[in-house]
Amino acid sequence: MEPSEVPGQNSKDNFLEVPNLSDSLCEDEEVKAIFKPGFSPQPSRRGSESSEEVYVHTASSGGRRVSFADNFGFNLVSVKEFDTWELPSVSTTFELGKDAFQTEEYVLSPLFDLPASKEDLMQQLQVQKAMLESTEYVPGSTSMKGIIRVLNISFEKLVYVRMSLDDWQTHYDILAEYVPNSCDGETDQFSFKISLVPPYQKDGSKVEFCIRYETSVGTFWSNNNGTNYTLVCQKKEPEPEPGKPLEEAPSKQKKGCLKVKSSKEESSETSEENNFENSKIADTYIPTIVCSHEEKEDLKSSYQNVKDVNTEHDEHNEKELELMINQRLIRTRCAASEYGKNTLSSDPSNIPNKPEELQKNQSHSEACTDLSQRLLSPGSSAESSLKGDFYHTEKYSSGNESSHQPSDMGEINPSLGGTTSDGSVQLHISSKEILDDNANPAHGSGRGEISCSFPGQLKASNLNKKYEGGAENSEMKDCECLPRDVHLKASDYFKKSTENRPSEEDYGTSKDNKEKRIQLDVDEKTSKNFRSIFYDQERNVGHLEITVEGIEASDRDLTSLPTKDTTIPTWAIMEDTFHSSRTPLGREEAVLTTPEHDLSSSEGTILGGLTGGVCSPRNGNVLKNDYLFQVEKRKSGWINPEDQNKDTQHQQSWNVLESQEKARGSKTNIAEQIKEQVDCEDMWEKRDNTGSLKATPAEALFTCQEAEHCELSPLADHGIPGKAEAGTAYIIKTTSETTPESMSAGEKAIIAKLPQETARSDRPMEVKETAFDPHEGRNDDSHYTLCQRDTVGVIDDNGVEKESHLDICNARLDEMRKEEAMSMHSPGKMRDREKLGIGNITSVEESSQVIANNEKATSRLDLHLEMPSADKKIFPENRDLGQVQELSKKTDIDNTVHSAFNSDTNRASRDDSLLSSHHTETSVLSCEQANAVKNTVTTTALQTSATESEYNCSPTRETQGQPASKPEEVSRGSRRVTSETRKEKCVGQMFQSGECNVEMSQGPMILVSESRENVERERHENEGLINSGDKEFESSASSSLPVQETQDQSNESLLSKYTNSKIPYFLLFLMFLVTVYHYDLMIGLAFYLFSLYWLYWEEGRQKESVKKK
């Protein structure tokens, strides 16, 4: 083994540690390499003293080591290596020492200003949430200690200082430490330290940093108002001392020794001088260095006396500063500007070092006062009221040397130069709030003072609401736009606030109405204020109608602003205002809804006027069709006094109807609704233009029902559009007041537009599906009775007249045309159909007309349909059965009158029976309808147990919902068949129709047409059906026959059934006794139990079969 290798190893016994030194140098070089890419300030080089000591040891031990090598007989190769290493080591060592000494010749100079006073600091802190409060530069090093003050937003908080040495290409974060006992309840303090290490100690190098404040609420940044906090490394030129001139030593080592000796003395002096220069540059708060206000001599000559002078004048300076601050506050009535604060700090250390700076600051303060006086125009009421608000904007109102005004406040003052002081203050406050909102996302933003009296203020508030958190520069520029644009923005804003409501508000409580009314009031007031200032522009602008356009009818008391060009569309209200899940009716209403005062003022808009005030969803208690009917009557000039008395009645019935619509109405097809509404509107416009109120009954019924908005698709959208449109066009009918009070609301207002299953489940009647299937093969188009509004067959004594009104929202035009052709070419066949109650196409329409005159017979929904005046004359007098019969005869005589009881009463009863065949209660309803026609309001509740609404002209479910059209349909069907000759035929054919055989209720037939004797006769004929236990017959009999007789008969039948059912049990018991007597008790008991089980099972089967039947 070679001893030359032993020194290369890490051995504590060896004194020669040359390899270790080389390794350490390599490590230092590696550290430098690491510094360059990452700019990490962590490790520092080894001190000069340590390196020199190492060098001394190596030099002294070098000879010894060589001697040791020679003594042991080792080769001198290792010595040669040592010699080659020694030569560069000398120069390297002293270069390092030189670098180490040069680090003390660099200082950090700040390029930023700190808050001059506590008040200014707190003001900025409210906005930015974190601020650099003070800095301290460590003497003799390129390092800075800083204190950050943060707003105490949340308990958990972290403060980082992010710094970069290469213009933010790379950066790293320094975690600031909490200063103990620094919390004052509102703020906290954190400290940090930035050091510039030798590799980056270059003249002109910059250190940029900013502050990141992390809280549970959010993260906030402070970067010196967008310019970053910047430190510049500058080389400090050392000043030679007079008594110790530097010697020009020939050797580097000697020169280095001189420096080492003088470095400690110079370091203290140079560090103090450097700090003094720093105070001149930055005007920052450095507690160790104090500059005197009376400093007039040369700084170098008087440096030793500075501290004494400052201690003598401490109290004097404080008094002077207080006096100056008080004078300036009294003079300006606002806080001094940022520059004034820099000059007028309460701390003597921040007094300007030079008189020029003091004059400069005074000029800035004067500029601030001038600007504030300009802001405070002569019209300001109290200047002192602006003091607090101006604090928030003072630093932005005047120019700033550093030119770091916030972008959001830059242009407020110029834009409001001519406005009053109140306006400026209001805008300052709103802008301040915007800053707070931007800085702190937790607080809700969008504050705006609408109550201000001048327009600029309202502009600012609207801008605040619209552009929260955005760049406020653009907003303030927008303030200077034309008044007309601002007016448009404000009105748009209020329109949005009015229209953009959740769908529940369409049917909301009165609280919603109040809120909306208040909002509209505010809109009106602000609009009036606008008009007072910008009246010229506003007269040419029609946008104020927005404030009225989207308002429901419940807000009718609010009047729109009476501008010249304000034209409010009558029925073009947006459907979005009322879009909701209300019912098809609600949607349809919304399409034609307008404020009522607009409708009343505009005579030309008939459709809007008719539907406007009534159709809004919140006024559901008002019968919209009543309003339509009344307005139309007023225009036409004919009004039935009985109809006037019925207004309140129909309004009440409409409430019940609407409630059931909500419960049973199915979802509607919006596209079909809109299409049908357009068609209906066209129809209304035609009718309004022509003014023909004496149209045929079919047209009258159809147009009226269109006005009711009970269109086909909304009521019949069950996946079978054709069927639904055909069958369930106009189902909504309300019963007359003949129905007893004991009846439920569902009975009083029946919506026939239900699925067949629903109809069966909701009502005790059965509906034959064949009646509803248009493709079932029936040559009578009864299932389209309501839809076929264009075919109106009126049969007089002279013959059959055919009037067709085509293209009026027809569900199936082709089938109707076929039916029209059939009815025109085969009047006899149509008569047969009428006998069966199928051909009563126009009966519904005519019935609504006839009953319109009967106060207690039907609701006004059918009355809306324009009836011929002759029809009205028919039914006001219907009081008795005899009168009903007389009326039927009169209608036979009057060909012009297209109303109810022209035809045979038997035929009417047969029509009723047809209806009863389709649902069990129809017979009862038909009886009631007959009673309603007779106006027998005093009939017992049992007789009128079913509502008239169940009585339908046609057997289809479509007719189920037309409560008022029953007797009229009967009469109309009879009317179609020419007079009395056809009556007789109908009497004979009553039971001949196969569809009417069992379910035909003779009672209703009798009530409608025949005398009391006929009623009794037909009642006896129906007794057999009553005994059968059929619900349909029981309901019809109960409505037509005396209640006591029907009850007696039913009691007898029940008694007989009960006794019959108990006979088998009695016989079984006898058999049990016999078995027990002859056989064992257990056997008899088992046989008895088995027999009982079998009997119960059989009886249950029988009951099920009966139910099915």
Curated annotation (Swiss-Prot):
<feature type="modified residue" description="Phosphoserine">
    <location>
        <position position="843"/>
    </location>
</feature>
<keyword id="KW-0597">Phosphoprotein</keyword>
<dbReference type="GO" id="GO:2001069">
    <property type="term" value="F:glycogen binding"/>
</dbReference>
<feature type="region of interest" description="Disordered">
    <location>
        <begin position="945"/>
        <end position="985"/>
    </location>
</feature>
<dbReference type="GO" id="GO:0000164">
    <property type="term" value="C:protein phosphatase type 1 complex"/>
</dbReference>
<feature type="modified residue" description="Phosphoserine; by PKA">
    <location>
        <position position="67"/>
    </location>
</feature>
<feature type="compositionally biased region" description="Basic and acidic residues">
    <location>
        <begin position="966"/>
        <end position="985"/>
    </location>
</feature>
<feature type="compositionally biased region" description="Polar residues">
    <location>
        <begin position="396"/>
        <end position="406"/>
    </location>
</feature>
<feature type="compositionally biased region" description="Basic and acidic residues">
    <location>
        <begin position="236"/>
        <end position="251"/>
    </location>
</feature>
<feature type="region of interest" description="Disordered">
    <location>
        <begin position="493"/>
        <end position="517"/>
    </location>
</feature>
<feature type="modified residue" description="Phosphothreonine">
    <location>
        <position position="58"/>
    </location>
</feature>
<dbReference type="InterPro" id="IPR005036">
    <property type="entry name" value="CBM21_dom"/>
</dbReference>
<feature type="compositionally biased region" description="Polar residues">
    <location>
        <begin position="1035"/>
        <end position="1048"/>
    </location>
</feature>
<feature type="compositionally biased region" description="Polar residues">
    <location>
        <begin position="360"/>
        <end position="384"/>
    </location>
</feature>
<feature type="modified residue" description="Phosphoserine; by PKA and ISPK">
    <location>
        <position position="48"/>
    </location>
</feature>
<feature type="short sequence motif" description="PP1-binding motif">
    <location>
        <begin position="64"/>
        <end position="67"/>
    </location>
</feature>
<keyword id="KW-0812">Transmembrane</keyword>
<feature type="compositionally biased region" description="Basic and acidic residues">
    <location>
        <begin position="1011"/>
        <end position="1034"/>
    </location>
</feature>
<comment type="function">
    <text>Seems to act as a glycogen-targeting subunit for PP1. PP1 is essential for cell division, and participates in the regulation of glycogen metabolism, muscle contractility and protein synthesis. Plays an important role in glycogen synthesis but is not essential for insulin activation of glycogen synthase.</text>
</comment>
<feature type="compositionally biased region" description="Polar residues">
    <location>
        <begin position="340"/>
        <end position="352"/>
    </location>
</feature>
<feature type="region of interest" description="Disordered">
    <location>
        <begin position="236"/>
        <end position="278"/>
    </location>
</feature>
<keyword id="KW-0472">Membrane</keyword>
<keyword id="KW-0119">Carbohydrate metabolism</keyword>
<dbReference type="GO" id="GO:0005979">
    <property type="term" value="P:regulation of glycogen biosynthetic process"/>
</dbReference>
<dbReference type="InterPro" id="IPR038175">
    <property type="entry name" value="CBM21_dom_sf"/>
</dbReference>
<dbReference type="InterPro" id="IPR050782">
    <property type="entry name" value="PP1_regulatory_subunit_3"/>
</dbReference>
<dbReference type="GO" id="GO:0008157">
    <property type="term" value="F:protein phosphatase 1 binding"/>
</dbReference>
<feature type="modified residue" description="Phosphoserine">
    <location>
        <position position="51"/>
    </location>
</feature>
<feature type="region of interest" description="Disordered">
    <location>
        <begin position="1011"/>
        <end position="1048"/>
    </location>
</feature>
<feature type="region of interest" description="Disordered">
    <location>
        <begin position="436"/>
        <end position="455"/>
    </location>
</feature>
<feature type="region of interest" description="Disordered">
    <location>
        <begin position="340"/>
        <end position="424"/>
    </location>
</feature>
<dbReference type="Pfam" id="PF03370">
    <property type="entry name" value="CBM_21"/>
</dbReference>
<protein>
    <recommendedName>
        <fullName>Protein phosphatase 1 regulatory subunit 3A</fullName>
    </recommendedName>
</protein>
<comment type="subunit">
    <text>Interacts with PPP1CC catalytic subunit of PP1, and associates with glycogen.</text>
</comment>
<keyword id="KW-1133">Transmembrane helix</keyword>
<dbReference type="GO" id="GO:0016020">
    <property type="term" value="C:membrane"/>
</dbReference>
<feature type="compositionally biased region" description="Polar residues">
    <location>
        <begin position="951"/>
        <end position="963"/>
    </location>
</feature>
<feature type="transmembrane region" description="Helical">
    <location>
        <begin position="1066"/>
        <end position="1086"/>
    </location>
</feature>
<keyword id="KW-0321">Glycogen metabolism</keyword>
<feature type="modified residue" description="Phosphoserine; by GSK3">
    <location>
        <position position="44"/>
    </location>
</feature>
<feature type="domain" description="CBM21">
    <location>
        <begin position="124"/>
        <end position="232"/>
    </location>
</feature>
<feature type="modified residue" description="Phosphoserine; by GSK3">
    <location>
        <position position="40"/>
    </location>
</feature>
